[in-house]
């Protein structure tokens, strides 16, 4: 194997299989673009993003690791979220949870 080479098995890879999902509409009410990364706790995103925050507690974007979604100013966009896995303990981000969900 060479540095940077991938060894991907044949077949389909299903991300986040069997995990709870949620589809919501999000509006960027701000005057600047907002980008949200794949593992950011969606509940704690920029306050200029308008959506039912309480519904998103314990969820993140259902996109490939290392990628992000960009919300342009004034844009409404539908996104799919997936439940955070593991121990469901959240630290950091905007500091709104800092512990168990």
UniProtKB/Swiss-Prot annotation:
<dbReference type="InterPro" id="IPR036461">
    <property type="entry name" value="Urease_betasu_sf"/>
</dbReference>
<comment type="subunit">
    <text>Heterotrimer of UreA (gamma), UreB (beta) and UreC (alpha) subunits. Three heterotrimers associate to form the active enzyme.</text>
</comment>
<dbReference type="InterPro" id="IPR050069">
    <property type="entry name" value="Urease_subunit"/>
</dbReference>
<dbReference type="GO" id="GO:0009039">
    <property type="term" value="F:urease activity"/>
</dbReference>
<comment type="pathway">
    <text>Nitrogen metabolism; urea degradation; CO(2) and NH(3) from urea (urease route): step 1/1.</text>
</comment>
<dbReference type="Pfam" id="PF00699">
    <property type="entry name" value="Urease_beta"/>
</dbReference>
<dbReference type="GO" id="GO:0035550">
    <property type="term" value="C:urease complex"/>
</dbReference>
<keyword id="KW-0963">Cytoplasm</keyword>
<protein>
    <recommendedName>
        <fullName>Urease subunit beta</fullName>
        <ecNumber>3.5.1.5</ecNumber>
    </recommendedName>
</protein>
<dbReference type="GO" id="GO:0043419">
    <property type="term" value="P:urea catabolic process"/>
</dbReference>
<comment type="similarity">
    <text>Belongs to the urease beta subunit family.</text>
</comment>
<keyword id="KW-0378">Hydrolase</keyword>
<dbReference type="InterPro" id="IPR002019">
    <property type="entry name" value="Urease_beta-like"/>
</dbReference>
